[in-house]
Amino acid sequence: LSLSGTAADCLSGWSSYEGHCYKPFNELKNWADAEKFCTEQHAGGHLVSFQSSEEADFVVKLAFQTFDHSIFWMGLSNVWNQCNWQWSNAAMLRYKAWAEESYCVYFKSTNNKWRSRSCRMMANFVCEF
């Protein structure tokens, strides 16, 4: 029996789409706390990730049934600052002095666009497994 998200496999209160289960939470948390919360809800749980515009549309409709705010955390971040950075002269980046501020991505449902902001910002969120 697969627990990958058919309608019968989703926990009570969760919604199924394309083999995954989703649940919006009307709780304000920073990105790290929201991600931690999602991992505690179900094995394999995380903040929502989008593989298509159809999936995003499904989640936005689901989210609006739970909260009025137009933004919510999704599982994309640059917490570890591990982008493939390279100097303009093609030298490898060996010395790093990143500011402590890291950026996480939230979904702005009024225009279905992604935006980055401090990971310390408080927002609602959607979990997925």
From Swiss-Prot:
Keyword field: Blood coagulation cascade inhibiting toxin, Calcium, Disulfide bond, Hemostasis impairing toxin, Metal-binding, Secreted, Signal, Toxin
Summary of the tissues where the protein is detected: Expressed by the venom gland.
Residues in the signal sequence: 1-8
Record flagged with keyword Metal-binding: yes
Cell location: Secreted
Any matching Pfam family: Lectin_C
PROSITE patterns tied to this protein: C_TYPE_LECTIN_1, C_TYPE_LECTIN_2
Residue ranges constituting the C-type lectin domain according to the UniProt record: 17-128
GO-annotated cellular components: extracellular region
Disulfide bridges in this chain: C10-C21, C38-C127, C104-C119
Molecular function, one GO term: metal ion binding
Gene3D superfamilies recorded: Mannose-Binding Protein A, subunit A
Similarity section: Belongs to the snaclec family.
Miscellaneous note of the record: Calcium is required for ligand binding.
Binding partners and assembly: Heterodimer of subunits A and B3; disulfide-linked.
Primary role: Anticoagulant protein which binds to the gamma-carboxyglutamic acid-domain regions of factors IX (F9) and factor X (F10) in the presence of calcium with a 1 to 1 stoichiometry.
Protein name: Snaclec coagulation factor IX/factor X-binding protein subunit B3
Organism: Trimeresurus stejnegeri (Chinese green tree viper)
